[in-house]
Amino acid sequence: MDGYARVGKLEKDLELGNGETLYPGLSYGENQLRWGFIRKVYGILAAQIVLTTVVSSVTVLYAPVNDLLRGNSGLLLFLMFLPLLLLWPLHIYQQKHPLNFVFLGLFTLSLSLTVGVSCANTDGRIVLEALILTSSVVCALTGYTFWASKKGKDFSYLGPILFTGLIVLIMTSFMQVGLFNRMYNMPTTPLACFHKLIQIFFVMTMQMMFPVGPTSVAIYGGIAAIIFSGYIVYDTENLIKRFTYDEYIWASVTLYLDILNLFLTILRMLRQGDN
């Protein structure tokens, strides 16, 4: 009887993967499928990060590219808003191969160019420090989220909190750049209005990337770093528990944006501290 009990316990352990599942209640088969999905997402994410590193390096090291982007405010503004435009077809065609990878590549490329411009205007030592700090934070938060999910912890409650914080962050950027005063003093002719709107959005975008004042940068950067760190935990848990197996593109996009925003926030804070 004791032998039968041991065999039964062994079969149960095999079915549950010796208890080493991603989160409690997940069967052994689902656990294997989920791990395959996670590896696929992180593979795509790694490719995005490599592409961003290469494109940013070219932008920094190849002077004509950097001069072209810095000297053409219209082109830089277009590249800043292009990722927002690409998010719509990327979401629509996320499950249609090869269009999903085409739009993902364009999305990553457009963001990489703007990151390159930010890095080109920053001392190399600061860029390296920001890269090391971001990598450390991402690895620590990712490891913690996997461990916490295995212990049965749930971070779904963070979604509304982080979204509210992000909205407050964006509205703060608008107020810093004086958007509402600029809109109130709009000219009357259509052409002048159009030019004014272009100026507003350009200044607004630059202010969101480079807020003015050391106190403003410290407060803004600290809150932004907390929010994007929270999003890494929240989206990593979504990767573990909630994303379907067909949403590998969208899962990689969310994590990529979390990491990129955290890097730019740390870069901004270190640059201001160095100044």
Placement of each model-derived feature along the sequence:
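A hydrophobic alpha-helical transmembrane-helix feature that marks the membrane cores
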Residues: 1-275
